[in-house]
């Protein structure tokens, strides 16, 4: 069986069955594994993977890894898939392919204190490859990668490409800050200008602040939902 090949400083850990790569990555990170661990499960119908990071900035700034990994996914699929396939990113981590929901990104960290430097952070990817039913049109708002003209995209190559393009994004973020990431993410963002409810706040999704917090204009004022709201398990 072939195994994925990753850039230097990244290492792979394959799991299968009932083991969730995201949970496994969090457990390994809590035990002190090196940053760059890629836990993955290349299932027949579902691609699941998780990256372990060791941020050296405050959590509120490190949360940029979530949109950064989203941009990395778009770049990865853009390099391997047909040019007409469109990828968009939801603020909360959801992925959209050709307008329909297709997988998600997740995030966890060792701490939920926005001003603390976390010991570790994990970003997880879940991507359906094939529809769950034989009649995918029954749920038009949901899709799968291979139902959107990407049947020639190899899941392992997509995983490798995601890690590679995410690394490029990390290097740019480290050298230049969030300016380029903001530009790239906004060009791929889904839902700006639309009505939304997040953290029990309803209003118009105006965009994001410097640290990718969601700005929602309600009747009374503009509310900010920090990206740390999306942290799991804290």
Predicted regions span which residues?
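Long, positively charged amphipathic alpha-helical accessory segments at protein N-termini or as interdomain linkers
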Residues: 1-34, 58-64, 68-82, 101-234
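Active-site-flanking structural segment that lines cofactor/substrate pockets
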Residues: 31-41, 49
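Short glycine/proline-enriched loop/turn "hinge" motifs that connect secondary-structure elements
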Residues: 38-44, 115-117
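Short, exposed beta-strand/loop patches in secreted or surface proteins that constitute
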Residues: 39-40, 87-88, 205-207
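Short, compositionally biased low-complexity segments
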Residues: 41-46, 134-137
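DPxDG-like acidic metal-binding loop motif
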Residues: 43-55, 65-70
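Hydrophobic residues embedded in beta-strands of well-ordered beta-sheets
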Residues: 47, 95, 213-215
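Catalytic palm active-site di-aspartate
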Residues: 87-99
